[in-house]
UniProtKB/Swiss-Prot annotation:
On the 2D-gel the determined pI of this unknown protein is: 6.4, its MW is: 38.8 kDa. It comes from Zea mays (Maize). Belongs to the zinc-containing alcohol dehydrogenase family. This is Unknown protein from spot 159 of 2D-PAGE of etiolated coleoptile. The lineage of its organism: Eukaryota, Viridiplantae, Streptophyta, Embryophyta, Tracheophyta.
Length: 15
């Protein structure tokens, strides 16, 4: 997502 990316940057094991 976009808003998620803003709060949660590319984190390992996100999706």
């Amino acid at each position: 997502n976009d808003w998620r990316n803003a709060m949660y940057p590319v984190v390992p094991g996100h999706e």
